[in-house]
């Protein structure tokens, strides 16, 4: 915090003095008057679009956020940034650009704030990469900032059955194997997404919204209400008020996003059994906040934080059920009471985590959606970092979805997702599907493999086939699936030298992933290896390849 904070630490550059007559004239044309020049200017950045249901609520929420800014004595100015729909981009060339969009969002928001000299930020997002992109921008800018999630959709209904987007991907695999009819696939397609909002389960969007709340960058309780729920409008207004109050107190994003706050976010992700993408994104956000966070910190925290949430893709419930029993604060209170959270971390309310939880008095875990710490689903957290001869720099597995922690099988190697998808009807129990050249550089963009993993599970092979990739998985992925293998294939990591018939061993309990080929043979293969030519030689993807680093460090651009 800073003594006697200036409410207009940056916007005076465009409002004060004779030299700024032209700037003031432009601002008058968008509605500002003489009475507004002394008000802090708050940028309201939104990833609203009509491309995907994930973002549809943001237009409404941005209006409410602006009302809150006005009510608190600030002046809001709204602008939009891009967003990519992972659900629509899955399984084809478009997915190369999903992770790239995270960097574009962070860069574009930073660019507008730096150019227009806004004093504070309300950041609204609904999709998997727009959430971390916004938080990365907040960390870079280090202004007073509040993040608000668009909210999730409600589960669809097919007869008496609740369905979601993962059911659609799995139905495709079942259809390819003759286990599900084309008519059943069509019925799921028409019913799984009934209203606006992000995917309903504890997939990447809901995981990152929960992480943002635990990090202290969102208002308590704001992650879980569904997108159509009008409580979100109240959270939006309160977010607008909160950012002005942060300015008054001189609290900026990096005052909130400390190492201890990131440890809180990791703890909540572990307790929820959240998406493997949280590893990638939290590492990237921490880097922008100048926080020293490493991939092995996830195991350190996961060792002591139990898995508590029985949520999809591996469990029975969705985010609206989490909301029904009290939301993310229920998990945070349980962890705080057990000494597993840092209660003294500052948040966007201007209060600490412990003070927030005392104010709202969340209920105890209900025992079904959220288990008590004394009766966890798993004794340790829902994610694990693996190392071994196949992943010297690390890999990630969602242990929350594993019925067994050990698998050894025979490699079936595919250079790219499409070849693996074509082979799904031919897979057999005991196969280890290796999909390579899908890393941050090699893909580029670390494509998510939900089309393949969903097809494998839908084909009835989810417990009998291991999938290993230097790409990523959707938050909707569950089962024997290992991602973020590093070093990636295009950098000459061991995954580049795997051949059909090699034996691969996963031991999630020991946290190892090994290629059972002797060192001399691997050395011969390495000597004969040449990386493939780049997929893109122009445009944003070509630029991204030149800048992006390893998944083990968050796939950040340097």
UniProtKB/Swiss-Prot annotation:
Keywords tagged on the record: 2Fe-2S, Amino-acid biosynthesis, Branched-chain amino acid biosynthesis, Iron, Iron-sulfur, Lyase, Magnesium, Metal-binding
Binding site for [2Fe-2S] cluster: 54, 127, 199
Binding positions (Mg(2+)): 86, 128-129, 448
InterPro entries according to UniProt: DHAD_IlvD/Edd, Dihydro-acid_dehy_C, DihydroxyA_deHydtase, DiOHA_6PGluconate_deHydtase_CS, ILV_EDD_C, ILV_EDD_N, IlvD/EDD_N
GO molecular function: 2 iron, 2 sulfur cluster binding; dihydroxy-acid dehydratase activity; magnesium ion binding
Cofactor(s) named in the record: [2Fe-2S] cluster; Mg(2+)
Coiled-coil regions listed: none
Gene Ontology terms describing biological process: isoleucine biosynthetic process; L-valine biosynthetic process
Domain of life: Bacteria
Record PTM N6-carboxylysine, positions in chain: 129
Record PROSITE patterns: ILVD_EDD_1, ILVD_EDD_2
Cofactor remark from the record: Binds 1 [2Fe-2S] cluster per subunit. This cluster acts as a Lewis acid cofactor.
Recorded catalytic activity of this chain's protein: (2R)-2,3-dihydroxy-3-methylbutanoate = 3-methyl-2-oxobutanoate + H2O; (2R,3R)-2,3-dihydroxy-3-methylpentanoate = (S)-3-methyl-2-oxopentanoate + H2O
Keyword Iron in record: yes
Function (record text): Functions in the biosynthesis of branched-chain amino acids. Catalyzes the dehydration of (2R,3R)-2,3-dihydroxy-3-methylpentanoate (2,3-dihydroxy-3-methylvalerate) into 2-oxo-3-methylpentanoate (2-oxo-3-methylvalerate) and of (2R)-2,3-dihydroxy-3-methylbutanoate (2,3-dihydroxyisovalerate) into 2-oxo-3-methylbutanoate (2-oxoisovalerate), the penultimate precursor to L-isoleucine and L-valine, respectively.
Known partners and oligomeric status: Homodimer.
Family annotation (NCBIfam families): ilvD, PRK00911.1
Stated name of the protein: Dihydroxy-acid dehydratase
Record organism: Acidothermus cellulolyticus (strain ATCC 43068 / DSM 8971 / 11B)
